[in-house]
Amino acid sequence: MKRFLLIISAVFSLTAYANSENAPQTTDGAFTTLMIAAADIGKYTETLRNNPSAFQATGTTGAGVCVTNSGNAYEGQMMVWSAFPDVTSALVGGTKYDPQQAPRQFKNLRDLKYGVTWKPLTPFRLEPGYERVQRINVPAENLQAFTEGLEKLEASIQAAGHPNFFNGVFVPIGGGTHEIETLMVRSITRDAQS
């Protein structure tokens, strides 16, 4: 088996809004992420909370931010995410808001890096909380074994007394050279102690 290349890890979700209580795990849906550098992460996050118009314009069913606390590639690294019921809605939503044409209050707080749409390959439950994220290169011939292994790992961790632990494996749609041949693995719990 070819070795896996870990690119970026460790993202902690600061804030999110989504109705996820007892949400089912599903491979339906898609996510968009806008990767940015924020000079003042707290101020940018607060501005997003107070001005949800960008999220509302895209038709998202849930949205939030994740801040990279370790393994970051640049200072102020964070992403703004949005959840959609399907890939089509995510792609169409991306045409309804242009982050490069954002109001000045947003532009002055962040530097855009790139955006990408993600499709889950394994059943995933949207329950924002504490997250660890890895971007991994997996050869195509090993993809099924890799996803099955992560599903078994999730079941084992849940059986060991952590029922709110979830893994998700996502494939990028777009994202340019930043996410090419990369899977995103998100391991999520309600908090770091869970």
Describe each PLM feature range.
Residues 2-7:
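Sec-dependent signal peptide recognition
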Residues 9-18:
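Hydrophobic h-region of N-terminal signal peptides that target proteins for export
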Residues 18-194:
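Short S/T/G/P-rich N-terminal loop/turn motif that feeds into the first structured element of a domain
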